[in-house]
């Protein structure tokens, strides 16, 4: 048995084509979705991520605005910029690129973004709504993961999902999203004593730990769906995931590659949230 490779880049392109059509229809009604991205400092990785978001906006027809601020900016000044964007009707989504400089409290910044424009899904109100199964902006990477699993046509309801990793960005929320889909969810983390045994029970295995090729075939139930969220750079310069892809390929039923797996879905779901926000706001641009 050789696993079917879930090509996240192809799924993302299909969804972006659908978003492009939606944006065209919105513009016919005078509604132009708008995303503001705040970049603080000159971190090369952050700048690269921001470029990807700008490119995605351009691709589907979303208006994007990049606000570049110096590393030395005060927290007060950054909060004032968010307040300005909260009140700007042209902007449906606000994203502050993380990480921020150490003198700025990320929690205060995230909580200042209006929940109606929280297209990253990080605001405590968004998280609370997600936890209780209410309509809200879902965090982009976890949402993208669920969409990739749905591409397999597997009925998630009743399946056992094992999540290895418990970060606030991926691990915790992705488990909650699968719980909302009526799956049975188990979390594993650095203190889990029988991780391999638990992992082998998974119909759907989500791995997000940041350790290159940690998960090998002996962690995998035959025929399982394996979603690899990790992105690690080896000494050779080559990218790899948290799953030993070649080793697991003959055991899993479905598997995502790294790169071109989960990554492309993250920005696509950000674009999706921005379009949804524009629909909800329904503000006609003049």
UniProtKB/Swiss-Prot annotation:
GO CC entries: cytosol
Record keyword Oxidoreductase present: yes
Catalytic activity reported: (6R)-5,10-methylene-5,6,7,8-tetrahydrofolate + NADP(+) = (6R)-5,10-methenyltetrahydrofolate + NADPH; (6R)-5,10-methenyltetrahydrofolate + H2O = (6R)-10-formyltetrahydrofolate + H(+)
Example GO BP: methionine biosynthetic process
EC numbers: 1.5.1.5, 3.5.4.9
Record Pfam families: THF_DHG_CYH, THF_DHG_CYH_C
Family annotation (PROSITE patterns): THF_DHG_CYH_2
Assembly and interaction partners: Homodimer.
NCBIfam families: PRK10792.1, PRK14186.1
Biological role stated in the UniProt entry: Catalyzes the oxidation of 5,10-methylenetetrahydrofolate to 5,10-methenyltetrahydrofolate and then the hydrolysis of 5,10-methenyltetrahydrofolate to 10-formyltetrahydrofolate.
Entry protein name: Bifunctional protein FolD
Gene responsible for this protein: folD
